[in-house]
């Protein structure tokens, strides 16, 4: 580029460099989209806009991609590196430039015909200034329409700092030429497909128009389901039809979101400022798979785990910056207090009560509102656990909203619904101190403005945040596979509950929890906490801690928990340095070196972070515990022991493997432990390696408390085979609390009611307890003896003496 064009672009770039602060999606286009910068790259934009072109150029230069203003030279021929699909509108409408996109596409394809080694990567790029979807009434022009020069000037002036450059996966022109030819009709088809691509991309980024709230309420009131519920309300409560209708409208006011794009923009500015000061980074993985689903027209339902009230804001912020529409979020009614309630409502929150029981009108209004969101094409987010996890582990799922999601499909007419499991991880959760108090029996404090201000005042260095998108679950595909005749239950009017609904919803919920855990994120904090809590003194020298972290990191990198899980790329030493900056640990220095200590008062709180990744390490920890106890053991006997205990672990921690997959996993882990020098393999036997016994023992300690808990329940069951399930849960908790006090077990989940409830249900499913309540004493004693070998003798004596004392 030379002469006047260079001067023109430089002059135009001056105001743009001040007014425009754009963000690239994805954040690092070349590696994330697999672009090969050694091969020619050309850019395709939807319509002629010099502002878009210069905004694209700034992002290309920032990410070491070719400059779109520099032409491509191929076989001595100079071609523009960018193509505008459409000339775009002009201020003076009588002047319409001739479109050149088809000619340029044809020129590029023709070069591939004459040069068999040429392979140009065509990268579609859209530049967006603002993403307001608009309202259903009152706007003649659609949002994100093509703008003429004057309109574009005002868009840049007002929305320049809310702009995104969206790079799409490249298309190989070599493949196009080889498979479809190079004539002009193929060039026309390419331009037509590109137009459709950009139209879909705009819809994925902006979403459908927002309804006028009153119009939405009127439509809901007119639905047959709500009309019938209003009649039933009037009849059952002996009130007038008008009064019952007012009750329904009041419920809609309580439930419905009041989405505002301007509030999204304002909050994005505030959160961007806040995150940069509180977090050292927010790590996002696998967002491209979600963008592709949105582009393909799927109705997206985000199903994250629930760690903190921060989840609502963090996930919406991340989705917005990934070029996706912030979802409508199901939030607990406890958050509907001033000023948080009105703010959350304008950010897309709709409010849900803890229980629907006994209120048919409420359940009908809520179900119809949710169905309306789906039918209009809005993305939705809800927390399938129902509440925030107090222990750091996933809670058993609550299936009410999930059931309504499938019922929405059974009304027909919705786009394909796809569930997106999401793992959210933190290095600091602001509520963790409150969680520990609640687990010890304190009453949950009601959410309020003073409580919110107290929480905000405590926000300091929060370390890193993690948002990992798990494997999507297309509901239609799932139902086709597991309930082939599900379409026979479609009823566009009534909410139906076919016989298959409840078991199917339960299976989907369990599968979602597994997929959330599959996307787990190991980080400096949870790895250091895992190692220090494994030490009985909660302290290790820096060398020991480094060695232990290397053990965890190598296990996770060389035998990954799943393809969606993430492990830090930093070294063990760098992770320790980062964790020490979080001010959770103490360091004692002496002449020999540093000792890193987890203070007693912090130990209980730090179990939360350890539990975030317990599922990723529990199997190697169990193997280490078995090998440590036996000193040497054959693979077959090791496999038998793991097989006995695995169903309990799988149910408790939502582990991913089926029983028939265990042999391969155990072999891979055993080989990795041998590679690390933790064990030696001789004649198909696993032996302890004495020179690395401490590392193996610390690895084994990761399963210690879980095995102690199982030992309690199996001993109680063996001692009293006719004990009923409720009493078994209660007595297990009592013994666990006693064990916790006598042996200094710091984990509050050690005697958590939900953990024992889940365990007892698994024992029934595995046949250790019959439906009549009686246990199989021979089987339970056999398992107890296996567990008794894996726990220390003093803990075993406490368990056995506690139950004898009760007898």
UniProtKB/Swiss-Prot annotation:
Location of the protein in the cell: Cell inner membrane
Pfam families: Acyltransferase (PF01553), GPAT_C (PF19277)
Positions occupied by motif HXXXXD motif: 305-310
Residues that span the membrane, as ranges: none
UniProt enzyme class: transferase
Reaction(s) the record says it catalyses: sn-glycerol 3-phosphate + an acyl-CoA = a 1-acyl-sn-glycero-3-phosphate + CoA
Keyword Transcription regulation set for record: no
Topology in membrane: Peripheral membrane protein
Main location: membrane
InterPro entries assigned to the protein according to its UniProt record, in alphabetical order: GPAT/DHAPAT, GPAT/DHAPAT_C, GPAT/DHAPAT_LPLAT, GPAT_PlsB, Plipid/glycerol_acylTrfase
The protein's Enzyme Commission number: 2.3.1.15
Top-rank taxon: Bacteria
UniProt keyword list: Acyltransferase, Cell inner membrane, Cell membrane, Lipid biosynthesis, Lipid metabolism, Membrane, Phospholipid biosynthesis, Phospholipid metabolism, Transferase
Disulfide bond positions: none
GO molecular function: glycerol-3-phosphate O-acyltransferase activity
One GO term (biological process): fatty acid metabolic process
Gene Ontology CC: plasma membrane
Biological pathway: Phospholipid metabolism; CDP-diacylglycerol biosynthesis; CDP-diacylglycerol from sn-glycerol 3-phosphate: step 1/3
Classification via PANTHER family: DIHYDROXYACETONE PHOSPHATE ACYLTRANSFERASE (PTHR12563:SF17), GLYCEROL-3-PHOSPHATE ACYLTRANSFERASE (PTHR12563)
Protein family (similarity comment): Belongs to the GPAT/DAPAT family.
Record remark on domains: The HXXXXD motif is essential for acyltransferase activity and may constitute the binding site for the phosphate moiety of the glycerol-3-phosphate.
Protein name: Glycerol-3-phosphate acyltransferase
Taxonomy of the source species: Bacteria, Pseudomonadati, Pseudomonadota, Gammaproteobacteria, Enterobacterales
């Amino acid at each position: 580029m030379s002469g006047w064009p260079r001067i023109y672009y430089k002059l135009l770039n001056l105001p743009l460099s001040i007014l425009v602060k754009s963000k690239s999606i994805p954040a690092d286009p070349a590696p994330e989209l697999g672009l090969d910068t050694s091969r020619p790259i050309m850019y395709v934009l939807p319509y002629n806009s010099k502002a878009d072109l210069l905004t694209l150029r700034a992002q290309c230069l920032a990410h070491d991609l070719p400059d779109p203003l520099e032409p491509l030279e191929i076989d001595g021929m100079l071609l523009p590196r960018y193509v505008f699909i459409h000339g775009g509108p002009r201020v003076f409408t009588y002047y319409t430039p001739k479109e050149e996109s088809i000619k340029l596409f044809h020129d590029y394809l023709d070069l591939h015909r004459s040069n068999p080694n040429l392979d140009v990567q065509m990268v579609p790029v859209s530049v967006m200034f603002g993403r307001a979807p608009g309202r259903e009434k009152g706007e003649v022009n659609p949002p994100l329409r093509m703008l003429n020069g004057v309109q574009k000037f005002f868009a840049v002036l007002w929305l320049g700092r809310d702009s995104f450059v969206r790079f799409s996966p490249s298309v190989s022109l070599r493949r196009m030429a080889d498979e479809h030819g190079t004539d002009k009709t193929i060039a026309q088809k390419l331009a037509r497909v590109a137009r459709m691509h950009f139209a879909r991309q705009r819809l994925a980024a902006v979403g459908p128009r927002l309804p006028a709230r009153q119009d939405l309420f009127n439509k809901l009131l007119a639905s047959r389901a709500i009309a019938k519920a209003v009649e039933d309300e009037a009849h059952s409560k002996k009130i007038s039809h008008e009064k019952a209708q007012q009750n329904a409208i009041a419920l809609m006011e309580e439930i419905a979101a009041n989405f505002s794009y301007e509030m999204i923009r304002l909050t994005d500015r505030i959160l961007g400022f806040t995150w940069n000061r509180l977090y050292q980074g927010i790590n996002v993985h696998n967002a491209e798979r979600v963008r592709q689903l949105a582009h393909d027209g799927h109705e997206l339902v985000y199903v994250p785990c629930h760690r903190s009230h921060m989840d609502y804001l963090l996930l919406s912020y991340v989705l917005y910056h990934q070029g996706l529409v912030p979802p409508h979020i199901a939030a607990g009614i406890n958050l509907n207090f001033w000023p948080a309630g009105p703010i959350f409502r304008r950010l897309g929150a709709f409010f849900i009560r803890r229980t629907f029981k006994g209120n048919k009108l409420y359940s009908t209004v809520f179900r119809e509102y949710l169905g309306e969101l789906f039918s209009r094409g809005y993305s939705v987010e809800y927390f399938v656990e129902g509440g925030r996890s107090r222990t750091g582990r996933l809670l058993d799922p609550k299936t009410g909203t999930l059931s309504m999601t499938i019922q929405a499909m059974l009304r027909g007419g919705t786009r394909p619904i796809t569930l997106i499991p999401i793992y959210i991880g933190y290095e600091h959760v602001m509520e963790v101190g409150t969680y520990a108090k609640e687990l010890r029996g304190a009453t949950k404090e009601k959410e309020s403005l003073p409580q919110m201000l107290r929480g905000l005042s405590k926000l300091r260095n929060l370390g890193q945040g993690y948002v990992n998108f798990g494997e999507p679950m297309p509901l239609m595909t799932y139902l086709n596979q597991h309930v082939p005749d599900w379409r026979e239950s479609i009823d566009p009017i009534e909410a139906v509950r076919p016989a298959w609904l409840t078991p199917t919803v339960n299976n989907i919920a369990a599968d979602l929890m597994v997929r959330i855990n599959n996307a787990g994120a190991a980080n400096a904090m949870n790895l250091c906490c895992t190692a220090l809590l494994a030490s009985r003194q909660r302290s290790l020298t820096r060398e020991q801690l480094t060695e232990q972290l290397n053990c965890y990191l190598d296990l996770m990198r060389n035998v990954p928990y799943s393809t969606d899980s993430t492990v830090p790329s930093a070294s063990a030493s760098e992770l320790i340095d980062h964790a020490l900056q979080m001010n959770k640990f103490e360091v004692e220095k002496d002449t020999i070196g540093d000792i890193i200590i987890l203070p007693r008062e912090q130990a209980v709180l730090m179990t939360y972070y350890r539990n975030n990744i317990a599922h990723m390490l529990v199997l190697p920890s169990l193997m280490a515990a078995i090998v440590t106890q036996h000193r040497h053991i054959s693979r077959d006997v090791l496999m038998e022991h793991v097989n006995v205990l695995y169903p309990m672990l799988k149910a408790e921690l939502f582990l991913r493997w089926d029983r028939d997959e265990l042999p391969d996993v155990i072999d891979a882990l055993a080989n990795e432990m041998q590679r690390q020098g933790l064990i030696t393999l001789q004649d198909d036997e696993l032996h302890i390696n004495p020179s690395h016994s401490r590392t193996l023992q610390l690895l084994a300690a990761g399963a210690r408390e879980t095995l102690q808990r199982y030992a309690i329940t199996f001993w109680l069951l063996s001692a009293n085979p006719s004990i009923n399930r409720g009493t078994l849960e209660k007595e297990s908790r009592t013994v666990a609390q006693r064990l916790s006090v006598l042996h200094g077990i710091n984990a509050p989940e050690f005697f958590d009611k939900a953990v024992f409830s889940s365990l007892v249900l698994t024992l029934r499913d595995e046949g250790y307890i019959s439906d009549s309540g009686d246990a199989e004493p021979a089987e339970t004693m056999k398992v107890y003896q296996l567990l008794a070998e894996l726990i220390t003798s003093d803990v075993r004596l406490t368990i056995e003496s506690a139950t004898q004392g009760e007898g």
